[in-house]
């Protein structure tokens, strides 16, 4: 059964939605599913741009055959070989054995590492600055290494301004019949998923993304066709601006995240006191997160959004409570930087988590750590009030800086 949509007069979306997968990359929850996008250009020569995960393989192949009709598939253009986009390549090769593959040298190498039977003469290796003409359409190739795999490239159709952006500009969430970003309320329905996708999948590679954005800024882009999520044909500066913030690690907006690690509720109670005092001072853009029950991908995503972070952790085995430690390791791995941070520690006989959390933050780039800290012994009491008030004042002063 065919279920494809037109992007332009001769370009079709031939992907599929997956509502069954619960964990993207077997780690990130996707409660609203995910789309695997592929595109088919019907020029004098036919060009399939990327394939799809095998979970939607049947729908994808039906769509390709539905658009092709009685025509042959001439070219398979591969921008990115991660299995969620490359898994259907063997079936494409079985159905159209004479198809010519256009991709990078490194992509061809990785495909063979995955066991794909690709003949050397079948591959047309391209690199930065190359282009290929398929009739009316000419597609130019731009290298995008480590966005977010080393073989990645993006492709630009110079005829109608279509950027095939691989995993850049993608998003979690199934399309559910929609195709274009202007068919949804993106700010309300999609932005959080797009941010969570970028920050957790691509977030480590901000400098590389900035290089791609710099190249993209010179192109007359009219459409952005990513491998996940909606196609952009309007408000393209909006999503480019979001990517500039995320890739440069600049907060989107001012806000204070209070992430707490609490075994029996005492550190949580202190975090709630802090939140109340901040709100009483007018800082209502304040959010609390239990690091033990909030999936890491949501914490990472919101920290790319907000400007301030308070870490409140109980001491555990003379160290940082393990889920909090894992959170800090993820922040370091994803290269998060340019945030203002504060520390609240707790411990019944040897509170030590504060110094250890501070040491981890100091290893990160451009992190401002406020001098005011709160150290609790077992539970928050009146003797902690003055230190907490000092911390609140420091956070308010930092928050209100221009």
Q: For the regions a protein language model found, what residue spans apply to each?
A:
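Metallo-beta-lactamase
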Residues: 5-9, 102-152, 205-211
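Short acidic active-site motifs
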Residues: 88, 294-299
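FMN-binding flavodoxin-like domain, especially the glycine-rich phosphate-binding loop
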Residues: 175, 186-224, 229-231, 273-289, ...
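Active-site metal-binding motif and surrounding structural segment of the metallo-beta-lactamase
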Residues: 44, 55-102
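Conserved beta-strand hairpin/beta-sheet module of binuclear metal-dependent hydrolase folds
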Residues: 4-65, 154-157, 161-165, 267
